[in-house]
Amino acid sequence: MTRQHRRMAGTSAALLLSLAGVLVPGAAQAQDPPARTALRVCQDPNNLPFSSTRGDGIENRIAEVFGKALGLPVSYYSFPQRLAFIRNTLRYKLPGDDYPCDIVMGVPVGFDQVSVTKPYYRSTYALVYPQGRGMDTVKTGEDFLKLDPAKLASLRIGVYDRSPASVWLSKHGLVDRGVPYQIMNADPAQYPGEIIEKDLAAGKIDVAIVWGPIAGYFAKRITAPKLVVVPLKSEPGVQFDFQMAMGVRYGERDWKQQVEGLLESRQAEIAAILAEYGVPLVDETFSAPGRR
């Protein structure tokens, strides 16, 4: 998944500063917080299928479900996810001011910049290709690798740099066929689904390998050519599937428990939203033997 790669500090001083950045917000919660007047969500304003200023993303829809359950209106604090998102949203606080938002609706399990809830879905990277272009027999990643060598050698495979997809191409000797896309693009007008909606649909690339929710959503939006989504199994050296959860500030245990209660009580509604957006869901058994 493209946004779960995080770097650690390289020196003792930097490490101490980063730890302080994590611990200070938690310490600030020692006193009882004021009663909530809204469900305040931290979001990327242009990150479909997850979130947008129009409120038509997966996470927007789930936030509305939560707001209704809590009897609170939903408000959003928007900031591009690629630009120090947590520091500038969930953990952003000026002296004398309140935090601008209280929850991040989608973070990978293990993400250490927030206190992570229990997971609410697991998805995997997926391969997307147009029907009728000589790949219709491909139903799995293994099928793709078994295509005629001449066919494989002709394909332009779009992948985001530093993603599991680029690692997979390298492992299977297909680096030369890769068309790299930048994960960290500073242009806020660009969005992850462009690789499918603009380039794959227009024939600029022949295949795209992207995070499953992106694959499923944008493949459904394209009517011509018809696109096929093939979930990929993790294998030794390449982890494709990840559990997704929500994130709150460290130290806010009561709020975290309340969010986890909503995840449990609204499980059916969340599942329906994920299905509507075409998210490929997998469980822990969906992997190649000995993948780790």
Language model region names:
Residues 57-70, 131-164, 236-281:
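Extended ligand-binding regions for polar small-molecule ligands
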Residues 32-107, 111-112, 186-190, 276-277:
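Extracytoplasmic small-molecule ligand-binding "clamshell" domains
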Residues 44-47, 122-126, 134, 220-263, ...:
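Periplasmic-binding protein-like
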Residues 12-22:
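Bacterial N-terminal signal peptides
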Residues 28-30:
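Boundary at the C-terminal end of the N-terminal hydrophobic targeting segment
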Residues 75-151, 231-239:
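Acidic, polar ligand-binding/catalytic clefts
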Residues 72-73, 91-106, 155, 196, ...:
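Alpha-to-beta junction loops
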Residues 63-73, 77, 141, 145-151, ...:
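Ligand-binding cleft/hinge of the Venus flytrap
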